[in-house]
């Protein structure tokens, strides 16, 4: 069992990026995956994550890979 909570972010736009920043503030958490169909949003969000992570453009692929313990849904 890991010592941190692994978060997946669904929606990498402005709200998703704010959630990434907030997870980064937590000692026992990190973002391990992000998902957004927009490549530009994925690229912007990727710059905020300092650890290893996976990025997806398809939500089914994200869920099937089971990269996270919890998901934050930040979509409109």
Enumerate the language-model features and the residues they cover.
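N-terminal Rossmann-like dinucleotide-binding module
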Residues: 1-50
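Beta-loop-alpha module in the N-terminal Rossmann-like domain of NAD(P)-dependent dehydrogenases
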Residues: 53-76
């Amino acid at each position: 069992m890991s010592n941190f909570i692994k978060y997946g972010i669904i929606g990498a736009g402005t709200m998703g990026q704010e959630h990434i920043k907030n997870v980064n503030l937590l000692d026992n958490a990190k973002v391990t995956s992000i998902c957004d169909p927009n490549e530009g949003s994925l690229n912007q969000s990727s710059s905020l994550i300092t650890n290893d992570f996976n990025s997806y453009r398809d939500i089914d692929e994200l869920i099937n890979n089971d990269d996270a313990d919890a998901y934050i849904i930040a979509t409109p």
